[in-house]
């Protein structure tokens, strides 16, 4: 089954919050190295999609599975689609879009996503976990997801009142065919204003199943504080 599953990691060098974020050192490995190595432990069909020669150079000791992409993409989804086209992925193959700033996604979670995707009718699958504190609700770097009783997403926000809010984890799964359809849509106003590409899916009536992961996952890396917390987490392991 893993032969028909691909993990694609979009990564760009520019970041409004952290300069050269993918290359930030976290206990002896760069952020993007940690994400990529985790993915390769799950499947050899793991690739980084980037527009940066610096990122490519940083990863060459790990794997040659680097796809160079345009620097004009407005979202990771669009970058992943370009990479998927270059890899000639089949229409019904499952693509997992793993965010390049999520270094602590466990293998157990990836396997859960694959299983839930096969069991639930959906266009897109993503992940949520428990809110750790009230700070998650008020932190704009922590994306919240609300879902209905069948675990289909109803909204994503950075801050707001939700009926049943959970912390959104940056991973998406879809077939190549669905990915192609999504990237042909115009970005929505809410997507651009909130910098949440998943709103494009939702506002165009694509069903998003939210796989609930009932274990703690450290936050992704968006700020210098996140970097410090990641180092503390690794030092405790």
Q: Where do the language-model regions lie?
A:
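N-terminal glycine-rich phosphate-binding loop and ensuing alpha1 helix
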Residues: 2-50
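Short, acidic/turn-prone active-site loops that include or flank metal/cofactor-
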Residues: 13, 70-76, 215-217
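Short, high-confidence coil segments that cap the C-terminus of an alpha-helix
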Residues: 43, 89-92, 119-123, 206
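Short phosphate-binding loop-to-helix
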Residues: 47, 53-115
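Conserved alpha/beta core of the MobA/IspD/sugar-nucleotide pyrophosphorylase nucleotidyltransferase superfamily
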Residues: 165-237
């Amino acid at each position: 089954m893993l032969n028909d599953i691909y993990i694609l990691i979009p990564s760009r060098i520019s970041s409004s919050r952290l300069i050269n974020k993918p290359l930030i050192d976290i206990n002896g490995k760069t952020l993007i190295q940690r994400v990529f190595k985790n993915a390769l432990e799950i499947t050899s069909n793991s690739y980084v999609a980037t527009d940066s020669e610096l990122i490519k150079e940083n990863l060459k000791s790990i794997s040659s599975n680097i796809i160079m992409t345009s620097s004009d993409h407005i979202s990771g989804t669009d970058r992943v689609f370009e990479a998927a086209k270059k890899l000639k992925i089949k229409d019904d193959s499952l693509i997992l879009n793993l965010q390049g700033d999520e270094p602590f996604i466990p293998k157990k979670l990836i396997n859960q996503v694959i299983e839930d995707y096969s069991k639930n009718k959906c266009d897109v699958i993503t992940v949520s976990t428990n809110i750790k504190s009230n700070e998650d609700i008020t932190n704009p770097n922590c994306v919240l997801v609300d879902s209905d009783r069948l675990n289909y997403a109803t909204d994503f926000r950075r801050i707001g009142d939700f009926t049943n809010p959970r912390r959104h984890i940056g991973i998406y799964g879809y077939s190549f065919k669905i990915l192609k359809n999504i990237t042909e849509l115009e970005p929505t106003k809410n997507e651009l204003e909130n910098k949440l590409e998943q709103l494009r899916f939702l506002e165009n009536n694509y069903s998003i199943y939210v796989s609930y992961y009932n274990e703690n996952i450290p936050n992704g890396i968006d700020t210098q504080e996140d970097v410090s917390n990641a180092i503390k987490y690794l030092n405790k392991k």
